[in-house]
Design a protein with these regions (language model features):
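Conserved ABC ATPase "signature" region
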Residues: 71-107, 155-159
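Hydrophobic anchor residue at the start of the ABC signature
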Residues: 125
Length: 189
């Protein structure tokens, strides 16, 4: 999991992500390049939101790489050029779309740290979805959730899998979540 997302670099061997249009060697990219080039996103076992930033800002942070390119690495943004403003508006629209999907539009301006735990989990997942990944890696997304929140998580993951056609690689102990979304299950002892 950590090698796949670039958190650790393998010492030997190769890792490829096969997509219909090309074969991407993950070993040659840094973690942020894996997200940008190979379209692999992840969440961590422990929530890694920016608690003092707003819910909306947390989703915009995920789109930082695209906005930096659109801004000419800050020049166009500083000059407030139309091309940058348009890209920025697209990023805001994408963030609002995902907030609507998880029912948090009304909390867009609240600090992410003020959300209930289950909502923070969903926010972290849709933050990863803001880069439009081909593969979403989730490390125990249901950890600490009650049964109602786990059911909401399953609904979100099914939407991501079916409607967004995003592959999901899941590490999880909650078997209702695993069996609710999985096509293939591998168990490690």
């Amino acid at each position: 999991f950590n090698c796949l997302t670039g958190f650790y670099k393998p010492t030997t061997g190769q890792m490829y992500l096969h997509q219909a249009e090309n074969k991407v060697s993950l070993r040659k990219y840094t973690d942020f390049k894996i997200a940008h080039v190979a379209k692999v996103a992840r969440t961590f076992q422990n929530i890694r939101l920016f608690p003092a930033m707003s819910v909306l800002e947390n989703l915009l942070v995920a789109q930082h790489n695209d906005l930096m390119v659109a801004s000419g690495y800050s020049l166009y943004g500083l000059l407030n050029l139309k091309s940058y403003r348009e890209k920025e508006q697209l990023a805001v629209n994408k963030a609002k779309y995902w907030l609507d999907i998880i029912g948090l539009t009304h909390r867009a301006d609240d600090n992410a740290g003020d959300l209930p735990y289950g909502d923070q989990r969903k926010l972290e997942i849709v933050r990863a979805m803001c880069i439009e990944p081909k593969l979403l890696c989730l490390d125990e997304p249901a950890a600490g959730l009650n049964p109602k929140e786990s059911a909401e998580l399953n609904k979100l993951l099914k939407f991501i899998k079916i409607e967004k056609k995003t592959g999901i690689l899941l590490i999880e102990h909650d078997m209702s979540v695993v069996m609710g979304i999985s096509d293939h299950v591998v168990v490690l002892n």
